[in-house]
Amino acid sequence: MHIDIMTLFPEMFHGVLESSIIGRALAREMITVNLIDIREFSTNKHRKVDDYPYGGGAGMVMKPEPIFYAMDELKKSPSFNVNQKTVFVTPQGNPYSQEKAKELSSLNRLTILCGHYEGVDERVRQHLVDEEISVGDYVLTGGELPAMVILDSVTRLVPGVLGDESSAKTDSFNNYLLEHPQYTRPAIFRGLEVPEILMSGDHKRIATWKTKESLKRTLSRRPDLLDKKSLTEEEYKLMREILKESPNKELDLDRL
């Protein structure tokens, strides 16, 4: 998979690209990442990429020319229009989710445009962007951090990147359930014990415990996810047990 990142601050990505899962994926050539410095496509001798907004208003707006010229350069690649999508990260976009990460990870090529200042000229959004994405209802200085979120979440879903494919499958949100609690050694720390069942060696009981704890945590913290979840027969049975154990929790099981 190839990922283009169009930004005014390419240096912000250096640490991310050299570290952890993304760094290993790049080293093993499972993904390739191209950082495009939008300033390099400015026609202004001072590399200016912003200007005052028409109609007045606070702040500056990213000019269309450098972004269009940068995109023109990307489009020269034969692979650009083959299973490719351009996304713009903005608070006005569609909420980002694990489902969207899965969708983007299936592309051959993903182009991420990072905004800055008060945003970009509307003509960029209308003619260069396929989809606008928001990573949350808050405002950041620029689109670089959201782009890193997308880069990380998409990279880990590329086949072979994690090594153990089950790691991605059991991540929170992967199946509209939050992940079950995790424990490691020591078995007892400051009087706090690991649940005995996890050390029992009984794989069937352990699997049931994990499923039940996952359901319990989702019901407690993100009940909205259960509206999207189709429970298996086992999950339905476990959810009934959970509701009996927690009478203060209300859930219409017939909807699931």
UniProtKB/Swiss-Prot annotation:
Record EC number: 2.1.1.228
Gene3D superfamilies, per the entry: 3.40.1280.10, tRNA(m1g37)methyltransferase, domain 2
GO cellular component: cytosol
GO terms, biological process: tRNA N1-guanine methylation
Pfam families reported in the protein's UniProt record: tRNA_m1G_MT (PF01746)
CDD domains (alphabetical): TrmD-like (cd18080)
InterPro entries per record: Alpha/beta_knot_MTases, tRNA_m1G_MeTrfase_C_sf, tRNA_m1G_MeTrfase_TrmD, tRNA_m1G_MTases_N, tRNA_MeTrfase_TRMD/TRM10
GO molecular function: tRNA (guanine(37)-N1)-methyltransferase activity
Catalysed reactions, as listed in the record: guanosine(37) in tRNA + S-adenosyl-L-methionine = N(1)-methylguanosine(37) in tRNA + S-adenosyl-L-homocysteine + H(+)
Compartments, as annotated in UniProt: Cytoplasm
Residues reported in the UniProt entry to bind S-adenosyl-L-methionine: G115, V135, G136, D137, Y138, V139, L140
Key words, A-Z: Cytoplasm, Methyltransferase, S-adenosyl-L-methionine, Transferase, tRNA processing
PANTHER family from the UniProt entry: TRNA (GUANINE-N(1)-)-METHYLTRANSFERASE
Function: Specifically methylates guanosine-37 in various tRNAs.
Family: Belongs to the RNA methyltransferase TrmD family.
NCBIfam families: PRK00026.1, trmD
Complexes and interactors: Homodimer.
Protein name: tRNA (guanine-N(1)-)-methyltransferase
Natural source organism: Natranaerobius thermophilus (strain ATCC BAA-1301 / DSM 18059 / JW/NM-WN-LF)
Gene designation: trmD
